[in-house]
Amino acid sequence: MAASPTTGTDGRPPAPTGTASRRLALGALLFILVGWSLTGLDITVDRLLGAPGDAWDIFRRMFPPAFAEAAERGVVGKVFESVHIAWIGTLIGALLSLPLAFLAAGNVAPAWVRVPVRQLFNVIRAVPELILAMILIPVTGLGPWAGALAIGVHSIGTLGKWATEAIEGIDEGPLEAVAATGGRWASGMRWGVLPQILPVVTSQWLFRFEINVRASAVLGMIGAGGVGSELVSQLVFRNFPAVGAVLLMTIVVVLTIDTVSAAVRRRIIQGAGR
């Protein structure tokens, strides 16, 4: 029996024609783009080869960490200031994003409302927290309030998108039941949607808080409060033992928050599934 013209001699479909040439072209394009990027960043082979040794030298000079000096400079307070910035920023994002998410969901909001709100979320997410903080510092002045506002604004975009997706994935039975009894739109959101999404949204808020703790440490480098300012100060003076102490304190706090938050989120999701 003759082989089908659409299959190979072993019964499998033949490989698409031109696959090898396309892969070669993509590989060449990737190589060109990498080379172009390295050239644009003024990165040479010597610098690449020397980077691991330089990094190891700095890392080695951080030990033993100068915890006593860091404590005298109030680094512990700065670390917790970063946590406070992240918490207030997350709270701002959570409180403002949830109402907006109801206006952005395709199954509960009309298009003339939904489209602008979704675009607002996109615009907010497109601007990093660092840029937002630089914009806000002339308004609020240097300090943690600028960092908290920057994190809060950026969290609105991310949390709003996540909450919108949660609303669009609900079971619409309770919503239809509220409408059948003559309930208004707000009643449908309160009794038909909110109970379904609240566990998911709460876990999203906690996850965003974990992200914001790390972001708040970076914002301090431009004067927006937190431990980042202390880290920059020690790096400028090349006080590497103090840098090591600051980094280790920050890492311990961040890992602790991540572990506790992950456990709480797991309990919330498991409770919602029962």
Model-derived regions, located:
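N-terminal, non-cleaved signal-anchor transmembrane helix
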Residues: M1-L91, L103, N107, I269-R274
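C-terminal transmembrane helix and the adjacent membrane-cytosol boundary/short C-terminal tail
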Residues: S203, G244-R274
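Pore-lining and gate-forming transmembrane alpha-helices of multi-pass membrane transport proteins
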Residues: E81, I85, G220, S229, ...
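Transmembrane-helix boundary motif in ABC transporter permease subunits
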Residues: I88-F121
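Alpha-helical membrane-interface segments at transmembrane helix boundaries
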Residues: V76-H84, V117, F121-I124, L206, ...
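Alpha-helical transmembrane segments of multi-pass membrane proteins
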Residues: R125, H154-G157, I251-D258
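Generic hydrophobic transmembrane alpha-helix motif, especially the helices
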Residues: F121-S155
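Membrane-cytosol interface at the C-terminal ends of specific transmembrane alpha-helices
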Residues: L142-R208, T259
